[in-house]
Amino acid sequence: MSRSGTWDMDGLRADGGAAGAAPASSSSSVAAPGQCRGFLSAPVFAGTHSGRAAAAAAAAAAAAAAASSFAYPGTSERTGSSSSSSSSAVIATRPEAPVAKECPAPAAAATAAAPPGAPALGYGYHFGNGYYSCRMSHGVGLQQNALKSSPHASLGGFPVEKYMDVSGLASSSVPTNEVPARAKEVSFYQGYTSPYQHVPGYIDMVSTFGSGEPRHEAYISMEGYQSWTLANGWNSQVYCAKDQPQGSHFWKSSFPGDVALNQPDMCVYRRGRKKRVPYTKLQLKELENEYAINKFINKDKRRRISAATNLSERQVTIWFQNRRVKDKKIVSKLKDTVS
């Protein structure tokens, strides 16, 4: 059997030093009774060491195990046997890995108690298409005892188990040097315990249309404004409407209804119907003469009347329609009076 296979078999036994077979090489070491070695890493063989060096190595391993709050079985026996041993070959202990990156066994996680002074907790959450991991200090209201005792622990009114995986929080610990940097990584919005971090590069805008009432302005009033140029590089300028001709058009609202603009004062808007413009006496005389000849007009007659009265063809057509309705009303009133 090879040297590595012998050490693996000795590491699997509970009492590897007493019942284990001796290595094939002459430079093999003697394991203490009750000692359990890790079989995942090959042992490191050293040369002739003094008893003082062996005791120092064992003390360093015990201190590392005590700092990580997880003692491997056989640590005390290894310390005692190494201090009194003077053999030529000494097994160097494997350096401890960071505790925050190791996942303890399920049995050890269930039985081992959490350290009382654990500075922060680690958790992960899904946001969008990615998975983010954060660390949260105990100052935001989340404690290990509350998580272990109550399955419905809440954070600011929201269930913790819905947003975080709290299965491994009891046995996990974080180095103390990561607390100041990690505590600021967690930020909650409205409804959580602490407000979000303010970003100075953005401006908090306040909504001005909070009442829910729609704006019914038909036109935009620019009275009192001077001509100005936009700061974004636009070359066009905006002037008051008083300086523009009558043919200029304005922005209109999307609300239905007949809305007209008062021409003398272009900057002041008003609602309602367009002001009625009465026809002149000459226009009415020409229209009445044509109506006396024929109550209905054709296309040629409409064009001729429009040219004579300086009215549009649509105005001529509407006037003839209204004139026929007026005759019907007069006839109906006469019938009512006679009857």
Curated annotation (Swiss-Prot):
Location of this chain's protein in the cell: Nucleus
Key words, A-Z: Developmental protein, DNA-binding, Homeobox, Nucleus, Transcription, Transcription regulation
InterPro entries, per database record: AP_axis_regulatory_Homeobox (IPR051003), HD (IPR001356), Homeobox_CS (IPR017970), Homeodomain-like_sf (IPR009057), HoxA13_N (IPR022067)
Binding region for DNA: 272-331
One GO location term (cellular component): nucleus
Pfam family, one: HoxA13_N
Result, substituting Q321R: Changes the function in transcription regulation
Key word Flavoprotein present: no
Gene3D superfamilies noted in UniProt: Homeodomain-like (1.10.10.60)
UniProt similarity note: Belongs to the Abd-B homeobox family.
Known function: Sequence-specific transcription factor that binds gene promoters and activates their transcription. Part of a developmental regulatory system that provides cells with specific positional identities on the anterior-posterior axis.
Protein name per the record: Homeobox protein Hox-D13
Organism: Mus musculus (Mouse)
